[in-house]
Each structure stands twice: as structure tokens, then as C-alpha cells.
Amino acid sequence: LPIPEDDHDAYRRNQAQKAQWTRGHHGVVNVTLRPLKYSWEYIDGVKRPIRASRQEKGVDVLCALALVDLARSGRYDVVVLASRDTDLAPALDNAARTTRTKIEAVKWFDPADRRTRGNISTQAKIWTTSMTRDHFTASLDPRTYP
């Protein structure tokens, strides 16, 4: 999530999208927005974010925690992780090993891109569904957030 001081329009659009996705789905859909990490500079004595420095941080940790928490809650038969991030393998293994919940994964697959082949390497046998460019296109949010 860009900070308002850096990109007010993007900040506003992210907030509008979050509101749309959660509207009418209380307790079912949870959207967590994390502020991007910035380097800062002082211009004329005023601290300003450097846009080119912004980075997404901590999202993989949030995904890992959510996966394990949802699996351990006992409220779900299946928990599906949608990611290609290999850093999440320990969370997949932990959830599969310590709960009765079935753990699955979903990843994007492009036959023309060798980097998208294979699955996240885990000790547990995790069912992984490969989604194509058509699936990706169909999953896009068609709304324009003003």
C-alpha cells in the first residue's frame, strides 16, 4: 500500500478496492493492506519518501501465518495457498503435518516460461493446481477504482 504522502491516488484506489471486496462479506473476506517500505530523503528540511525505493515487505510472513492459523483453527476442510513463493514451503509443511485440514496450493503456469514449471518443494505431499494465463485473466478485478 503506497503511503498517501507518496501516491495519494494509488492509496485511495487500494482503500476503495479493499472496501469493495469486503462489503457484504464480514467474517468471510479479510483484506490486509501493508504499507510499502520506503527510503527517505530530506529536501529543504522536509522528510520525503523516495518513490523508486518502495518495496513490499512482510507479505510472505503474513501468508505463512494466515495459512497455519486457518489450518489450525479447525473451521476449514481445505486451506489453499495461492503463491509460487518457495519461502512458504515450511508453512505448507507445518500446516500439513500439524492439522487434519487438507492443504493445497495454486500457482500460475505459463508453458512458455520455464520459471513457472514445477511446484513448491515440500516434505509433505501437497496437491498443486496450475493456473494458466486464461485463468489469470479471468481472475482480474474488472472494476476501475476512481
Named regions from a protein language model:
Residues 1-75, 115-146:
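A charged nuclease-like catalytic/ligand-binding cleft shared by nucleic-acid processing domains
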Residues 58-62, 70-119:
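Active-site histidine-anchored catalytic micro-motif
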